Amino acid sequence: MLLLLFLYPTPLSFKSSDVKNVRFILCFKYFALYLHNKQKSNNRMSFTEHCNEIFNQAIRDYHVTDNVDTPINNPYDIESIENRLYLKCWIDTVQWHFEDLIRDPHISPEDGMSLKHRIDRSNQDRTDLVEQIDSYFRQLYSDITPLPDATINTESPAWAVDRLSILALKIYHMKEQTERKDASEEHIKKCKSKLNILCEQQKDLSLAIDQLLDDIQHGRKYMKVYRQMKMYNDPSTNPILYKKK
């Protein structure tokens, strides 16, 4: 009803005796607008809710084939943060299954070494992508002037998002364990307990990330990003590689 009052046009001409009625209608119209905007604000997803939705989508998409060689089909525009988040979780999901495969006790030395190289490349891709996401945040908050007493966080937003992506994977696979038909009741019970803890951790981490972003946006915290500077993949810093030159 309030929304209808807001949408209904106010008469342009009226008698002086109608002033009170018009003011009353205008008050209702502004109040309806306030409620409408408040409802829109309440319905807007937080950043981490958006992340978790995208992470779950990537995990589901991967498990359609459940094959580490499945080509990615990223549904988001290449310039968007959603594209980076989807790619991040896809890399994490593939690497999760790399880690399963390499622990096969019957894997041949050749296949194991090949898989180890793929894991190394995946780790580097993951690190590069996290740094891209941090660059997004730095650009997003580039106009924010930190308050004089602003503090720094223990990790950058993107590395916290990295942990959130891994948590989504843990929750997915732990839930799988609770639904196994070939497992004992004791196994199912333990996995359900672990699943509850993981879900609580996801809730807490999501809140912490959203609070961190709010603090950065309002100048209470500031970003300071350190590149990972991994050495084992760099031929100039890994002694096994540079000594063979």
Stretch-by-stretch model annotation:
Residues 13-14, 35:
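Compositionally biased non-globular segments, especially hydrophobic aliphatic-rich helices
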Residues 23-25, 30-36, 41:
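Short, positively charged and aromatic/hydrophobic N-terminal segments
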Residues 44-245:
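Anionic, Ser/Thr-rich low-complexity intrinsically disordered regions
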